[in-house]
Amino acid sequence: MTKIAVAKGDGIGPEIMDAVLSIFDAAQVPLQYEVVEMGRWVFDKGFSNGMTPEAQQTIESLGILFKGPMETPKGKGVKSVNVTARKTWNTYANKRSFQTLHGVNTVFSQANIPIDLTIVRENIEDTYGGIEHMLTHDVALCRRFITRPGSRQVLRYAFEVAKQKGAKRITCGHKANIMKITDGLFLEEFYNIAKEYPELKADDVIVDDLCMKLVTRPDLFDVVVLTNLQGDIVSDLCAGLVGGLGFAPSANIGDDISIFEAVHGTAPDIAGKNIANPTALLLSGIGMLRHLGLLEQAVTIENALLYTLESGVHTGDFGDKSTPSVNTTEFANAIISNFGKLPANNPRATQTNEPVTITMRQLAGNPMLETAAEAALSIRGADLFIASNEQPQVVADKLQQHLGGIFKLVTISNRGTQVWPKGSIYTNLINQYRVRFETADASNTSQQEIINLMQRVSADFIICSSELLNYMGDKALYSLAQGQ
């Protein structure tokens, strides 16, 4: 019998988890549970990552975590335990399925527009690294990482999801029209992997256009894959299409460890009242059962849930307000009483169990994700980010004194817009510039020469940050300033 780790969570977490586990027990789900300590009270005990060492060890030995909603203390400088868990165990893909649930009234259900949409979100990278700095008292910087290996992991998973779902179309949402290198890399890898799945129609859409289309015709989409921040926003938008986060399951998938959770809040205002809606956590649990190959029990529970919703049974947060609502325990018991019944709409077909054995890799060190470079990297200059409240021409005049016969000053930009050698007097400035130096003869240079340049520039300016201007062969690996 497979053993999994269970973290009940904060607020309403324990009561909805108990309700879901009671349904599992009634369905004779062949799982054993080891409860681990994670969440708000663990932070309060002084564990800055929101979990005890024993919890981490247990999860890393079992490979599956089933968790309720958790709270991160506000204003204490600690990271979200939810994000920490996903990143620590490299659960690189977040899968969220959104379907019309009969008995949950929405604008689209009333218009008879069916929704069967899957969002796959990259789960590790992007701005969610949380690498932020104040460069001056007025300027904050957040670094955004999009990597080729990380993109390939989540994109390949998304194509496999589409294949297993029987989808005909997979769409990449992006902002590559603006973020040409980061989102451009993600989009490039999307189409590279698409070549391996000729049976799927692969297309892309700019994310703002995607959002507009999703709230007007969500039935036109099947599987959508996005980078982390955009995927976070779009997946919550899609939850609103089917009734809210209370009906939105979530799975965080990694090569070794996977996490199944409800992504709604802890609802402390109703905690302990036994009135919370356990549907999202139950749907996440059903996804976990499928992941573990427990298909028979997953089908039994899902059909019973769908039948219960169709029958009009509801907790206080949804459903027909003219009929009495039930509490959390009563809702779970109603589902149990409906085992063996089929919903009128979209019943799930009976399946036979195909149990999956979770085998944890024995690692000698952290896996290094790296692809083969097309050519050797070379350095041809640097962007220096300097603090100054002087006018661009004054900054340029000072910088010109530090070229050392090797570099030329190419451009100065402010908030990404060029202000020297050309620009507009109507461009507002802040007290930090990006100044770009390139080798005078377009030849390669060394890191030591860049360090020497920085030493000279530091005589007049505080250097807040820097980036090398790399080439791969004849291809520049950096963007131009707006207006350059």
Segment roles from a protein language model:
Residues 44-141, 229, 233:
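N-terminal glycine-rich phosphate/adenylate-binding segment common to multiple enzyme folds
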Residues 340, 344-484:
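C-terminal non-catalytic interaction/assembly regions of soluble proteins
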